[in-house]
Amino acid sequence: LTSLILLVAVQAITEEDLELLRQTSAECKTESGVSEDVIKRARKGDLEDDPKLKMQLLCIFKALEIVAESGEIEADTFKEKLTRVTNDDEESEKIVEKCTVTEDTPEDTAFEVTKCVLKDKPNFFGDLFV
């Protein structure tokens, strides 16, 4: 689940952004130890309640500064990065309002945010997210 993206609505995702996201995802995969099968299913929107997948998501969210060290979602950063993908400030705002949650652990928070985003936008993250 490699990731949401950076910056404001007027700026689109660049090849450099995509490469950074791929690199971050690969580094997080090494750190989390999540299996390729779990990642493949996650790319299709089938998120397993897997501790390693949750670690993967949290790692990516931290790298993108979507999650603070405290484990809370940084709503402004989350919206900024979403807007790079959606190119729609209003849509991003709705997603952030709906999907910004705080669970018992930072891993669970990242997992639940991801599930929420994918409910409305099943292909939102595509091959990047994990």
From Swiss-Prot:
Post-translational modification: N-glycosylated.
Signal peptide: 1-12
GO MF term list: odorant binding
Subcellular compartments: Secreted
Disulfide pairings: 28-59, 99-116
Major place of residence: secreted
Keyword annotations of the record: Disulfide bond, Glycoprotein, Secreted, Signal
Keyword presence, Secreted: yes
Expressed in which tissues: Tubular accessory sex gland.
GO biological process: sensory perception of smell
UniProt xrefs under PANTHER family: GEO07291P1-RELATED, ODORANT BINDING PROTEIN-RELATED
Family listed: Belongs to the PBP/GOBP family.
Name of the protein: B1 protein
